């Protein structure tokens, strides 16, 4: 570790958070989880294990719709687990999907599969007694849930660009390599969930599981990584702790990456020491130094990230404490090379190409719109059965996108008609507005314990109301990137939307506006603690002006800033909470 006198280590003067004690005492993430699995008196986990299961890709939840009713009956909340699979780049094979579908139908409370905006799937409502069978199933089909939550590098995103097939494959391979390189070395996951063996702590174990990159207490906080291929910013590359922007050479081949750090969208209502942020550029690295750069950033965050205050522990706060130049210098010291100047690139859009597109390899790719990523069977839309039927005949692969949609990828010309017929039969191909196509929400109620307001369950009707507003003002064919998140933790990425709703209380939200279409700008708070109907009324007035006063092709988010309806967020750590503190500079 570097000299502790270096700027950025002031937090060491304060007591460590209890999570640091928990990790130290966990026997490399094993804890006493095996003992808890045998306890049939509760559906949940006790003590440290409640937190430790997160390192294995799970969260303990309960059904909040019936929580009060159960407490009234002197019953504990109906506890179960959320499981998040590790799936770098979101690619999954049809045979894997068939098994994933079967488990969801037979063993989860909600009998659904949730596609996430981090390009993976989640199970909701897995009972404790089915956890080991679930992990063994995943292991048997080449999958796992290692490090998809808690203080580690989480699922690595990669642009889903089926048209540029060769470049996408190259970038995807690096996304996989980064994911594997930054995984914990501990066998704790396999010992607990696959082998079911109790391993006592010993000196030999410490030598085997030294964790040369993550360290024995892993990272100070969650850590998110993405790989993007311009001009498509579908992964919201500015929202992650570590980002790789693919750069092509003159022959169209991948030659290296621009490396960006310090993005993140979570904050806390009323806590001005917290803020969402867009990532900063460190510079360019050629392909052969990609993993060294990833490791250098992780080690710098490991050593300098705040282990006292978890609310200020993400990379953006480490950079604020060290300065960007100081952070860059430490990363360069770790990887023993210097960053080259950032190479030119441009992002122009974020949305998925819904429908059929043809790749340069002449294969076809069908992107299916899945509202909020929820794959389930309803009488009018048996989507879950539809995807299962596709998996039974599809010869290519599936790709989960960072917009919560599903690509049926690598379809041969002769198979295209069959794939389309199945998709149409089960309602997987539908006519939707541009507004709905680009909308997103987190899960929120009833399963998320942090949710302050609804998100996924109110999004469909809310978008229908906004569709009426756009039609009223003759801009129904336009797109405004709209997102709802049930709390300020930011899982719905509302802090990179043109219209972002952040849950404040049941039925009430903070309304942020002024993000941009390419995902480069944080939206600012416009109205606080208002209802969905009040938000619709506010948007009605703003869209009326946008429809008549905008410049040619001017996006809604750009219009509200140019028209001085709202001030831009320029430097989030300075002016996110107070627009009067804006320092004139280039708007990010």
Curated annotation (Swiss-Prot):
Gene Ontology molecular-function annotations: 4 iron, 4 sulfur cluster binding; heme binding; metal ion binding; NADP binding; sulfite reductase (ferredoxin) activity; sulfite reductase (NADPH) activity
Pathway: Sulfur metabolism; hydrogen sulfide biosynthesis; hydrogen sulfide from sulfite (NADPH route): step 1/1
Entry-linked InterPro entries: CysI, NiRdtase/SiRdtase_haem-b_fer, Nit/Sulf_reduc_fer-like_dom_sf, NO2/SO3_Rdtase_4Fe4S_dom, NO2/SO3_Rdtase_4Fe4S_prot, NO2/SO3_Rdtase_4Fe4S_sf, NO2/SO3_Rdtase_FeS/sirohaem_BS
GO biological process: cysteine biosynthetic process; hydrogen sulfide biosynthetic process; sulfate assimilation
Protein name according to UniProt: Sulfite reductase [NADPH] hemoprotein beta-component
Family: Belongs to the nitrite and sulfite reductase 4Fe-4S domain family.
Cofactor annotation: siroheme; [4Fe-4S] cluster
Cofactor binding note: Binds 1 siroheme per subunit. Binds 1 [4Fe-4S] cluster per subunit.
Residue sites binding [4Fe-4S] cluster per the record: 442, 448, 487, 491
Record keywords: 4Fe-4S, Amino-acid biosynthesis, Cysteine biosynthesis, Heme, Iron, Iron-sulfur, Metal-binding, NADP, Oxidoreductase
Annotated siroheme binding sites: 491
The organism of origin for this protein: Actinobacillus pleuropneumoniae
GO cellular component, one term: sulfite reductase complex (NADPH)
Gene3D superfamilies tied to this protein: 3.90.480.20, Sulfite Reductase Hemoprotein, domain 1
Outcome of mutating residue 319 to V: In strain: AP213
Binding partners and assembly: Alpha(8)-beta(8). The alpha component is a flavoprotein, the beta component is a hemoprotein.
Outcome (variant: residue 35 to D): In strain: AP213
HAMAP family named among the record's database cross-references: CysI (MF_01540)
Impact when changing residue 218 to Y: In strain: AP213
Role played: Component of the sulfite reductase complex that catalyzes the 6-electron reduction of sulfite to sulfide. This is one of several activities required for the biosynthesis of L-cysteine from sulfate.
EC identifiers of the protein: 1.8.1.2
Coiled coil start-end: none
Pfam family, one: NIR_SIR
Taxonomy of the source species: Bacteria, Pseudomonadati, Pseudomonadota, Gammaproteobacteria, Pasteurellales
Catalytic function, reaction form: hydrogen sulfide + 3 NADP(+) + 3 H2O = sulfite + 3 NADPH + 4 H(+)
